[in-house]
């Protein structure tokens, strides 16, 4: 790699074209220099050749002789390529009517191609295998700042960063391995051009053109004249290698070479443009001026953006008539800098468009020399958005002693050099006659100043261009409202007064009204017929009338009077704490406020739970004498209180009850350790106590726990297409004690005839509570004495006692449950923290979902 001092990049070249004038033919008999005649003929042919190039005249005037020859060769090569690629024959271009139609079609295609280039976020680039720019679209100037004529048929390595040249050369090779060129990277860096020895391939050595590995997508940095930070712009190249037809190149032996591969790619900026930049990126226009900045020409884009024709633009006089008064001195400073140095630098100002609209532009003007002397000015303008223009206006250094827009300029010894609209005090006289008498005294005539002076250009401007509302008045209104609101009150006052639209409107304009009243001396000095008042225009845009000002004054008076009398205004009350407290309480109680699903108040639920806790603690000593049904009634009620209501959309048929009326033969108590309950996530509220649940009346002690966590799961899962229910009747015996519980067991469990069980119609299903089917699907049981088996009885819908249950079941779903017939008895086990175990012969109940409380 060579040192950085020897690396050069492409730059803008300032050329001084030779004056092209037709010299008279010398008279006969007068001797002339043969070499001079040869040079004259050569210059004449070059001028004629340059006029045939498809470039604007201002570009052609800057071309030197070598550039004319280079661009001519490039144009002929491009034409040969399209002749072969489009398969156009000379016969297609012959004939009168056919030729006319072909010209119209070509013109339409040309217009469509221009529109496609403008819509494209990037430019088109074609690079040959020897790294020459075969073609570059004209939009390359919008991204890199180079003219199309500056890069065509030049080495592409002059535009590429030194660190990316090797990668670009690798992408040009069809196999991504340019190993044929020795020290190619070093040769590229030092020579800034293609390798000295080019390698040509025959079609047999190259893959098909439509092969997938001929596609290319890579990134590299290109030289950018528009970027003042680094001078390079990261671009993404996406395209493919294709054959470049019609070049008719010859080898060293004179043989015609076959078409070679070239990179056809679209280069787009790596950083996508913002939404605001998309609208203005393709509207760079150029204007031509005299040395005093008088317009003398404008391109088509400038006429489209500004709305003027070239005649309207060039017959107005000084170009400062199209510049905003606040930007005149700023542009004059750049104008002087351009006369001294040849280039003005980036200048941001406002240009006057047609229909009295101001457009922010970023301009760069430079001098064009002819015969060693400045001839004219070429200015390149790029439109900006209003937001960008205001940002540049804020960043502009206030080194100038004054601005025209503020009324502080005292350039000439006159009383007031401004027109009435430029008067810093916008308050006018009341009568029209006094205004007419005053205007001639303060407005100087056009003949008072030099025609090319800034004051003359300012006076020649129409007053209406400063009265016309801007295209986007939202920023002005937002700043105006923000300033007024900040001075009128805090956000609490605005929040309290948000219910009244009129009060809010008065608050927003309070500061502006105070300023207006201070200038005028009172509301009587403000008249709606004063249309030239800037403040009145703003008030009119906001929908504010002078009656609103009087109402505002009355409101201020009454508010001041109430404050003086000691009355407390509701606006002065700080309700922030109350609002935050209410929101916090609402968030804390969000889990208890499911009003759509709950049927009992939260307070009633909590109070009943505490009351039941106290009652159950008092009854622990009396449980030995109580029947099991009476002991289970509070438990059933507590379960109803404890279980929260589920969503109404999840409706399952639930049966609330317990095995209160069933009695195995031996005394059995059921152990329910806390650790095991926590393991199964059934009783999350138990805190380190193991409780026993009674299953028969002979139990000596049967304490139970009051704090139960809800286990909201259905008793029986829903099944389809069957109404048959099989319940196990084995290992269960009827109770020896008469049942007194309000919850009898389901009548479908058929038992001996001496006792019948049915559904209690009075038991309200308050909540979709769940139920343990004997607690046999979750807990394993210790073996105990054998019980008298009861034959399994099948449920039938024909039994009268079961019609109530069947109607309830069929209203929610159809069940088809078959319980295993072998059920072991439950033995009494000591209170322990260990796990319970099933019998080896006991089968689990996978289809029964455990739920509820015992």
Curated annotation (Swiss-Prot):
Q: Where is the PAC domain?
A: 346-387
Does this UniProt record's set of keywords contain Cytoplasm? Answer: yes
Intervals of motif Nuclear export signal:
63-71
Q: Where is the PAS domain?
A: 111-175, 270-340
Q: What is its main location?
A: cytoplasm
Q: Where is this region: DNA-binding?
A: 37-65
Check the record and name the Pfam families matching this protein. HLH, PAS, PAS_3
Protein name, please? Aryl hydrocarbon receptor
Give the organism, scientific name. Mus caroli
């Amino acid at each position: 790699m060579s040192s950085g001092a020897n690396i050069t990049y492409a730059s803008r070249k300032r050329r001084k074209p030779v004056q092209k004038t037709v010299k008279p033919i010398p008279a006969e008999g007068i001797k002339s220099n043969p070499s001079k005649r040869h040079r004259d003929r050569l210059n004449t042919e070059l001028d004629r050749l340059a006029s045939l190039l498809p470039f604007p005249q201002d570009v052609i005037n800057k071309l030197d002789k070598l550039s004319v020859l280079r661009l001519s060769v490039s144009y002929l090569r491009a034409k040969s390529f399209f002749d072969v690629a489009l398969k156009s024959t000379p016969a297609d271009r012959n004939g009168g009517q056919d030729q006319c139609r072909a010209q119209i079609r070509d013109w339409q295609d040309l217009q469509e191609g221009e529109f496609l280039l403008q819509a494209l976020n990037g430019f088109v680039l074609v690079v040959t295998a020897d790294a020459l720019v075969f073609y570059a679209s004209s939009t390359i100037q919008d991204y890199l700042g180079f003219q199309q004529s500056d890069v065509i048929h030049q080495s592409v390595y002059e535009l590429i960063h030194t660190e990316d040249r090797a990668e670009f050369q690798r992408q040009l090779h069809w196999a991504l391995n340019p190993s044929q060129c020795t020290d190619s990277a070093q040769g590229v860096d030092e020579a800034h051009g293609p390798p000295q020895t080019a390698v040509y391939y025959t079609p047999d050595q190259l893959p098909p053109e439509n092969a997938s590995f001929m596609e290319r997508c890579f990134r590299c940095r290109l030289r950018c004249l528009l970027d003042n930070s680094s001078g390079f712009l990261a671009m993404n190249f996406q395209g493919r290698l294709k054959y470049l037809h019609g070049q008719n190149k010859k080898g060293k032996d004179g043989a015609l070479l076959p078409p070679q591969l070239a990179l056809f790619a679209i280069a787009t900026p790596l950083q996508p443009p913002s939404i605001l930049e998309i609208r203005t990126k393709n509207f760079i226009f150029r204007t031509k001026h005299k040395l005093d900045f008088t317009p003398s020409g404008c391109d088509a884009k400038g006429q489209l953006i500004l709305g003027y024709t070239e005649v309207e633009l060039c017959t107005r006089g000084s170009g400062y008539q199209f510049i905003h008064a606040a930007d005149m001195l700023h542009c004059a400073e750049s104008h002087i800098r351009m006369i001294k140095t040849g280039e003005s630098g980036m200048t941001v100002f406002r240009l006057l468009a047609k229909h009295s609209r101001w457009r922010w532009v970023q301009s760069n003007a430079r001098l064009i020399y002819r015969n060693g002397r400045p001839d004219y000015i070429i200015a390149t303008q790029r439109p900006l958005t209003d937001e960008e223009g205001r940002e540049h206006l804020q960043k502009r250094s206030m080194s100038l002693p004054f601005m025209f827009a503020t009324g502080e300029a005292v350039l000439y010894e006159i009383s007031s050099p401004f027109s009435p609209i430029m008067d810093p005090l916008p308050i006018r006289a009341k009568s029209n006659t006094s205004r007419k008498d005053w205007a001639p005294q303060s407005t100087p005539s056009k003949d008072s100043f030099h025609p090319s002076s800034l004051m003359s250009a300012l006076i020649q401007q129409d007053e209406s261009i400063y009265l016309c509302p801007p295209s986007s008045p939202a920023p002005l209104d937002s700043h105006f409202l923000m300033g007024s609101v900040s001075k009128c009150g805090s956000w609490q006052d605005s929040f309290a007064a948000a219910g009244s639209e009129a009060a809010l409107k008065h608050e927003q304009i309070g500061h502006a009204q105070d300023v207006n009243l201070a200038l005028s001396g009172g509301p009587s000095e403000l008249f709606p017929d004063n249309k030239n008042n800037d403040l009145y225009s703003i008030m009119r845009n906001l929908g504010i009338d002078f009656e609103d000002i009087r109402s505002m004054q009355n409101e201020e008076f009454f508010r001041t009077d109430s404050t003086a009398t000691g009355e407390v205004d509701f606006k002065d009350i700080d309700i922030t704490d109350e609002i935050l407290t209410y929101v916090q309480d609402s968030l804390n109680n969000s889990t208890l406020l499911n009003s759509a699903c709950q049927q009992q108040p939260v307070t009633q639920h909590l109070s009943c739970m505490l009351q039941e806790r106290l009652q159950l603690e008092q009854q622990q000593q009396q449980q030995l004498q109580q029947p099991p049904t009476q002991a289970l009634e509070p438990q059933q009620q507590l379960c109803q209180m404890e279980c929260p209501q589920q969503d109404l959309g999840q409706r399952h048929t639930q049966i609330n009850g317990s095995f209160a009326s069933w009695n195995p033969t031996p005394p059995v108590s059921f152990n329910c350790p806390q650790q095991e309950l926590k393991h199964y996530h059934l009783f999350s509220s138990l805190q380190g106590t193991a409780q026993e649940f009674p299953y028969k009346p002979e139990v000596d002690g049967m304490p139970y726990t009051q704090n139960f966590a809800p286990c909201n799961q259905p008793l029986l899962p829903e099944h389809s297409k069957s109404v048959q229910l099989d319940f196990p009747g084995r290992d269960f015996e009827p109770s020896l004690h008469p049942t007194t519980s309000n919850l009898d067991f389901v009548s479908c469990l058929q038992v001996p005839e001496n006792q019948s069980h049915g559904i209690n119609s009075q038991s309200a299903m308050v909540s979709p509570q769940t139920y343990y089917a004997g607690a046999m699907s979750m807990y394993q049981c210790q073996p105990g004495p054998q019980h008298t088996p009861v034959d399994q009885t099948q449920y039938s819908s024909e039994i009268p006692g079961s019609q109530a249950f069947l109607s309830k079941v069929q209203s929610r779903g159809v069940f088809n449950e078959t319980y295993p017939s072998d059920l072991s008895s439950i033995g009494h086990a000591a209170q322990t923290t260990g796990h319970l175990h099933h019998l080896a012969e006991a089968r689990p109940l996978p289809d029964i979902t455990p739920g509820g409380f015992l």
